[in-house]
């Protein structure tokens, strides 16, 4: 009998904060399942979810504006604890008769809150004693409006010099509001506060662990597919790799993996994928060499968006052809993860603006008529990595820098040719190798090389050469929504440049990209 890892669950209502997914990840780290829903859910949906507690997120709106979002009334009638964060605290205050006003003194960044009263949520949690000898917390604020009068039956737990109601509580109903963001690392005791809310106030058990997730997923996969066969497109990336191992554990050789070698992979990647999954793990893999087909389809195409669509279209064609050979297959597996589900839901509202086609999302023909299996759809990326480790995948593989779905197709600028891909593969391998040797690889968030379709004059020995240019790119980021270019040491960059120019015949110049995001994107295309 497996543990019901969804037995205790937290519902997070999203009011639009940039940090909302971070709240969910923090709750999962505590070991408790949670889901993230839009703020305008119905009473029926909340009842069906049956949460042990509810968190109201922050958001960019103002409760003083007409028509601003409000928490559904049932949230406060469900008989479970509620934690309002920033905007969530403000809307809770207004809905219970308190007042919120636009503040002339906005708080963005570090603040110190002084704890003035006992609370079940904060008992024993503090960073230091302030000058008056009162316990205080170092927190991260990000708000313009502030509560100026708290509702009846609420008390003030803590305040700052400019925010008289930084923490409020109705202890009897177990309703709490914090004006700061406990989910960000800048709030030093933030994780302890969330743990106290989830484990003590909501009385959840920490059942959400990698081992229990694997056990639960295997049981559910067996229930879903029965004795049927499943097909999966295996890329060697984290998501498809973990999906493959979960399915293999659940149904064994009734899983067929199709590995499409499109000629746009990193150096020796196809060999590594086959050795790892067919060799070490014993998976049933169909290896499809399709470099010529992809490069032929890409010939003459310079537009980045058109390249992406072409790569996606050809992949679907190749995969469809292989799938049609597997007559016994009834299910298609995909490595969809929870942020993909959230993003798709947001796109369905019409509020999302497409900057680029998503690197890792594609469609398959409806005529395939296969059922869909998505073992990772409840998981964040960091959870997928932890499960991969538990399943025996190497740490280095699970923690490689992101690689786009179209591969080198979006790292060769302009038209994609075999010559360009071969040069880029060699140059990129040198860059990554040197990052590892200098212990810099894990200190940057993403690093790669871009092929520029321009020639530059160089000197080699006594002769001139007129060869291609590549750019090195390395960034530091927390969420990949914004990024700073990495300040790699000059001597390191010089060493990489020398190796590439001397070892890769056809490249005469190496440059380093010092663009941040925004205004640039991380990938060049």
Swiss-Prot record:
Keywords: ATP-binding, Glutamine amidotransferase, GMP biosynthesis, Ligase, Nucleotide-binding, Purine biosynthesis. It catalyses: XMP + L-glutamine + ATP + H2O = GMP + L-glutamate + AMP + diphosphate + 2 H(+). Its EC number is 6.3.5.2. It comes from Photorhabdus laumondii subsp. laumondii (strain DSM 15139 / CIP 105565 / TT01). Disulfide bonds: none annotated. It is an enzyme of class 6 (ligase). The keyword RNA-binding does not apply. Residues 208-400 form the GMPS ATP-PPase domain. Homodimer. GO terms for molecular function: ATP binding; GMP synthase activity. GO terms for cellular component: cytosol. Pathway: Purine metabolism; GMP biosynthesis; GMP from XMP (L-Gln route): step 1/1. ATP binds at residues 235-241. Catalyzes the synthesis of GMP from XMP. The active site is at 86 (nucleophile), 181, 183. Residues 9-207 form the Glutamine amidotransferase type-1 domain. This is GMP synthase [glutamine-hydrolyzing].
């Amino acid at each position: 009998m497996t543990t019901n890892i969804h037995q205790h669950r937290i519902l997070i209502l999203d009011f639009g904060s940039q940090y909302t997914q971070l709240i969910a990840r923090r709750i999962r780290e505590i070991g408790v399942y949670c889901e993230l829903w839009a703020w305008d859910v119905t009473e029926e949906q909340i009842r069906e979810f049956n949460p042990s507690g509810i968190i109201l997120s922050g958001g960019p709106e103002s409760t003083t504006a007409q028509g601003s979002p409000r928490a559904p009334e049932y949230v406060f009638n469900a008989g479970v604890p509620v934690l309002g964060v920033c905007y969530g605290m403000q809307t809770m205050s207004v809905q219970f008769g308190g007042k919120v006003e636009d503040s002339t003194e906005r708080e963005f960044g570090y603040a110190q809150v002084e704890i003035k009263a006992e609370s079940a949520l904060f008992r024993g949690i503090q960073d230091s004693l302030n000058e008056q000898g009162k316990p205080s917390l170092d927190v991260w604020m990000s708000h313009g409006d502030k509560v100026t009068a708290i509702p009846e039956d609420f008390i003030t737990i803590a305040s700052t010099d400019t925010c008289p109601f930084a923490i409020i509580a109705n202890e009897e109903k177990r309703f709490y509001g914090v004006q700061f963001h406990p989910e960000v690392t800048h709030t030093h005791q933030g994780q302890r506060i969330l743990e106290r809310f989830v484990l003590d106030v909501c009385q959840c058990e920490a059942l959400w662990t990698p081992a229990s997730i694997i056990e639960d997923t295997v049981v559910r996969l067996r229930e879903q597919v029965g004795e049927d066969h499943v097909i999966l497109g295996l890329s060697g990336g984290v998501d498809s790799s973990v999906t493959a191992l979960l399915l293999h554990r659940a149904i064994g050789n009734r899983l067929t993996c199709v590995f499409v070698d499109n000629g746009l992979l990193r150096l020796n990647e196809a060999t590594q994928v086959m050795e790892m999954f067919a060799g070490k793990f014993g998976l049933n893999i169909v290896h499809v060499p399709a470099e010529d087909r992809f490069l032929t389809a890409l010939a003459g195409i310079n537009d980045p968006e058109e390249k992406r669509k072409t790569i996606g279209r050809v992949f679907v064609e190749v995969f469809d052809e292989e799938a049609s050979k597997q007559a016994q297959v009834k299910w298609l597996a995909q490595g969809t993860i929870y942020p993909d589900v959230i993003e798709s839901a947001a796109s369905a509202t019409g509020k999302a603006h497409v900057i680029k086609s998503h690197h890792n999302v594609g469609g398959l023909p409806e005529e395939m008529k296969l059922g869909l299996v998505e073992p990772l759809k409840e998981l964040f990326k960091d959870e997928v990595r932890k499960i991969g480790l538990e399943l025996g995948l190497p740490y280095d593989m699970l923690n490689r820098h992101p690689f786009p779905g179209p591969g080198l197709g979006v790292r060769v600028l302009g038209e994609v040719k075999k010559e360009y891909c071969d040069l880029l593969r060699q140059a990129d391998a040198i860059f990554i190798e040197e990052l590892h040797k200098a212990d810099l690889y894990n200190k940057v968030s993403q690093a790669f090389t871009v092929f520029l379709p321009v020639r530059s004059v160089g000197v080699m020995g006594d002769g001139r050469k007129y060869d291609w240019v590549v750019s090195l790119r390395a960034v530091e980021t927390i969420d990949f929504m914004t990024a700073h270019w990495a300040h790699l040491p000059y001597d390191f960059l010089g060493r990489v440049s020398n190796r590439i120019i001397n070892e890769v015949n056809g490249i005469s110049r190496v440059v380093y990209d010092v663009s941040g995001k925004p205004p640039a994107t991380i990938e060049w295309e």
